Design a protein with these regions (language model features):
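Peripheral interaction segments used for macromolecular assembly
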Residues: 1-89
Length: 89
């Protein structure tokens, strides 16, 4: 099966199709599974017992290949900037 890469800059990502798909970043950083989109934000959740939640701006999405939503940020950026505030405290 051939994957179709859809660049986000063309505003052609169908956001309802990314729910329950994998979210990844630079160097294959794992941001878990997309739980929902809300406004300009993609909410992902990683982990089974020790869940981490990320609130990633749609503007950082690079492409969606049908299985994975790729972002243009590193794992460190996601952990330091886009985590749930309650988890950081």
């Amino acid at each position: 099966m051939k994957s179709i890469i859809i660049p986000a800059d063309k505003e052609s990502i169908y956001w309802n199709e990314v729910v329950k798909k994998e979210a990844r970043g630079i160097d294959d950083a794992d941001f878990g599974e997309v739980q929902m989109t809300m406004g300009d934000t993609v909410i992902t959740e990683k982990g089974i017992t020790d869940k981490k939640r990320f609130y990633l701006p749609k503007s950082l999405a690079d492409k969606f290949d049908g299985h994975t939503l790729w972002f243009t940020i590193t794992e460190d950026e996601a952990y330091n900037t886009y985590r749930d505030i309650e988890e950081i405290l």
